Regions:
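Short glycine/acidic-enriched loop and turn motifs that connect beta-strands
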Residues: 1, 61, 98-99, 142-148, ...
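Loop/turn-rich, solvent-exposed surfaces of beta-rich toroidal or solenoidal domains
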Residues: 174-181, 190-201
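Structural signature of eukaryotic scaffold interfaces centered on beta-propeller domains
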Residues: 41-49, 83-86, 125-133, 181-185, ...
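Trp- and S/T/G-rich repeat-edge/linker motifs of beta-rich repeat architectures
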Residues: 1-40, 62-79, 101-123, 155-176, ...
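Entry beta-strands of beta-propeller and related beta-repeat scaffolds
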Residues: 49-55, 89-92, 133-139, 187-192, ...
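Short, solvent-exposed loop/turn segments that connect beta-strands within catalytic domains
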Residues: 15-21, 47-51, 87-89, 130-135, ...
Length: 268
């Protein structure tokens, strides 16, 4: 997504179970897409009636069922900072005054809370996992008042109440990254990012979401990727991880990677 148009490409295998080697992108024109849209706030909510897109613009929320036709959702008000949409049918809304969850586009709100400080308010990435057979969501992102040396994941089991996974042990935490991206992939947690803005040069892994280490082998970024200086977004469509660089007016690139153990013999 850009401010001017959306672009799409196939990411599913064809009838021969082959994935596209080249990304053939097509343009989708918008109708009523909001000015000053905060592109990093875009989320996709899965629900009983399919999927729906939401984005924040000037502290208001706008939605679309197809990515092309957009409308303003007045019930959310005009104090929205960010959105999280990882639980089916539940949209978590972060405002100037706190956090709440809604199942009906803001008509009814379940007031939530976060334990501690420095809850993410922008560039939020989320991932789903299970703990004791219960669905959970983990997020990372930027906080306007964060003075911590760590990238701290936050976890929720309902979208309303959030707990930080702080690490007090020496040298086994994920350092503070400029634009961290979290994912649960191949039965491990990963955080991608860099200490520098608009760079992607490190992957950290964890088995519990608390203790982290930098990957040294098997799961690494290509050297050419680490030399790119541009904003990026990352999407997991297992078994693939897609990294999209762009948005700075000069650099546009798409990379795709995977763990070999997750690839079937037919796909490889």
């Amino acid at each position: 997504f850009t401010q001017d148009a959306a672009y799409k490409t196939a990411i599913q295998p064809d009838e021969n179970n082959k994935y596209p080697s080249d990304c053939n992108w097509t343009t989708e024109a918008y109708t009523n897409f909001p000015n000053n849209a905060q592109l990093s706030s875009l989320v996709t909510l899965s629900g009983d009636n399919g999927q729906k897109l939401y984005i924040v613009a000037d502290n208001t929320v706008h939605s679309s069922s197809d990515g092309k036709l957009w409308k303003k959702e007045a019930e959310f008000g005009d104090k929205v900072q960010a959105l999280i949409a990882s639980f089916p049918n539940i949209l978590t809304v972060i405002t100037d005054n706190g956090v709440y969850a809604t199942k009906d586009d803001g008509v009814t709100k379940e007031t939530g809370e976060f334990s501690g400080t420095n809850f993410p308010t922008e560039n939020i990435y989320s991932t789903n996992f299970e703990s004791n057979y219960q669905p959970q969501v983990m997020i990372v992102g930027k906080s306007g008042n964060d003075q911590s040396e760590q990238t701290v994941p936050w976890v929720s089991s309902n979208g309303s109440y959030w707990v930080p996974l702080n690490n007090t042990a020496y040298n086994v935490y994920c350092p503070k990254l400029a634009n961290p991206v979290v994912m649960y992939y191949g039965e491990n947690y990963y955080i991608f990012g860099s200490k520098e803005e608009n760079k992607l040069d490190a992957i950290y892994t964890s088995v519990d979401g608390i203790s982290w280490r930098k990957t040294q082998r098997k799961f690494l970024l290509d050297k050419d990727m680490t030399e790119i200086t541009a904003p990026y977004s990352i999407v997991v469509n297992a078994p693939y991880i897609w990294v999209i660089f762009g948005g700075d007016g000069s650099t546009n690139a798409v990379w795709r990677g995977h763990l070999n153990k997750l690839m079937s013999a037919e796909v490889q």
